[in-house]
Amino acid sequence: MADQANQPTVLHKLGGQFHLSSSFSEGVRARNICPSFSPYERRFATRNYMTQSLWGPSMSVSGGINVPVMPTPLFANAPAEKGGKNFMIDFMMGGVSAAVSKTAAAPIERVKLLIQNQDEMIKSGRLSEPYKGIADCFKRTIKDEGFSSLWRGNTANVIRYFPTQALNFAFKDYFKRLFNFKKDRDGYWKWFAGNLASGGAAGASSLFFVYSLDYARTRLANDAKAAKGGGDRQFNGLVDVYRKTLKSDGIAGLYRGFNISCVGIIVYRGLYFGLYDSIKPVVLTGSLQDNFFASFALGWLITNGAGLASYPIDTVRRRMMMTSGEAVKYKSSLDAFQQILKKEGPKSLFKGAGANILRAIAGAGVLSGYDQLQILFFGKKYGSGGA
C-alpha cells in the first residue's frame, strides 16, 4: 500500500483529462493540472497519465501546480529508483490502462474526428450531408455502419501508446539539460523561451516516430462508408492505410500536416504558460493562494482555454491528413487555413471541440476506476496509460 503514495490521485487525473486536443497523440495521451505534492513530482516527470492528445504531460511551475505541457519524451533511462523488472511491470500495466481508457473513450473520439473532418469527407464523396451535432453523428454512424464501428481506428490509437512511452524514457532529460534555464536565475523570458524550445524539440522528436500511427488512426476513424459507391470503405484496416498511402503519396503522405503539428506544440505551451503566469498572481492571492480547489479550477480553465485557442491547428493538420490519396491537396498548412476560412468560415476550425471535452472526461473516469481495481486486486497501483 505504501506505493500508492507515489501515484496520482483521481483529481490529478481528472484535472488533466479536460485538456482539449490530442494527442497528437496523439497521445495524449499524462496531463496533470492539479496542485502537485512532492511524492508525485518525480513520477509525473517520467510518466504520462492522460489519454490521448497532442500536447500533454506535466511539469512543475511556480505555485506548486503540476501543469500539462507537451508530451516531452526526453532522453533518459528508466527511473533510477526502480528496478528493471518493476519498470517493465509499470510499463505493461500502463499499457493495459491506456488500452482500457482509450477503448472506453473511442466512440466519442471517433465522433469528434468525424465532426472535425466532415467537410473533407463531403468533398471526397464519403459523406452525403453534414452532421447536425454529436447526437446526430452517433445516430447516423450506428445506423449506417453498426455499433461496433464506433471503435474504428482504436487499435492504432492503443498501439501508439507503447512507442510513445518508450520514446518518453529514451529521450528523457536530454532537451531539459540542453535548455536548462531557471526562472529565478535566468529571468522569466529566458526561462519561457527555453521552455518553448525544449518542449517543441522534444515533442517534435517524439511526434516524428509516432505520427504515421496518428495519421492511420485519423484516416480509419474518418473512413465512413461511402455515400456514393454502395457503402464501400476506403481502407480495410491499419496495414491497408499504410499500403495505399505509400502507393499514392509515398512517405510524404504519412507525414502530411506534421509541420503544423510541431507548431501546435509550441503554441499550446506558449498559451498555457503565458496565461498561467499572467493570471495566477492576480487570482490565487490571499486565502486562495494555497487552496487546492482554486488551483485545480485555475488549471482546468487555463488548460481548456489554451486547448480551445490552439484547436484550429489540430483541425488544420487533420484536414491535411485527409487529403493524402486525394487528387486535390492543400499546398501547405497556411493554404489549408486560408481555404477553410474562406469557404467554410472560422466556425469550421472548431468543429468537434465539444466532443473532445466529453472524450477527455470519459477517459478520466475510466482511468480513475482502473486505479481502484488495481488496488483491489493487487494491493497497489501500477502504471497508468497516457499519451
UniProtKB/Swiss-Prot annotation:
Alphabetized Gene3D superfamilies for the sequence: Mitochondrial carrier domain (1.50.40.10)
Region (Important for transport activity): 317-322
Transit peptide segment: 1-77
Ranges that cross the membrane: 87-114, 155-179, 188-208, 258-279, 293-313, 353-373
A GO cellular-component term linked to this record: mitochondrial inner membrane
UniProt motif Nucleotide carrier signature motif: location: 317-322
Activity regulation note: The matrix-open state (m-state) is inhibited by the membrane-permeable bongkrekic acid (BKA). The cytoplasmic-open state (c-state) is inhibited by the membrane-impermeable toxic inhibitor carboxyatractyloside (CATR).
Listed GO MF terms: ATP:ADP antiporter activity
Main localization, broad class: mitochondrion
Topology term for the membrane: Multi-pass membrane protein
Alphabetically ordered keywords of this record: Antiport, Membrane, Mitochondrion, Mitochondrion inner membrane, Repeat, Transit peptide, Transmembrane, Transmembrane helix, Transport
Repeat (Solcar) residue spans along the chain: 85-178, 190-282, 290-376
Domain of life, source organism: Eukaryota
Compartment(s) of residence: Mitochondrion inner membrane
Subunit-structure text: Monomer.
Similarity field: Belongs to the mitochondrial carrier (TC 2.A.29) family.
Purpose of the protein: ADP:ATP antiporter that mediates import of ADP into the mitochondrial matrix for ATP synthesis, and export of ATP out to fuel the cell. Cycles between the cytoplasmic-open state (c-state) and the matrix-open state (m-state): operates by the alternating access mechanism with a single substrate-binding site intermittently exposed to either the cytosolic (c-state) or matrix (m-state) side of the inner mitochondrial membrane.
Domain notes: The transmembrane helices are not perpendicular to the plane of the membrane, but cross the membrane at an angle. At least 2 of the odd-numbered transmembrane helices exhibit a sharp kink, due to the presence of a conserved proline residue.
Name of this chain's protein: ADP,ATP carrier protein 2, mitochondrial
Species: Zea mays
Lineage: Eukaryota, Viridiplantae, Streptophyta, Embryophyta, Tracheophyta
Gene, per the UniProt record: ANT2
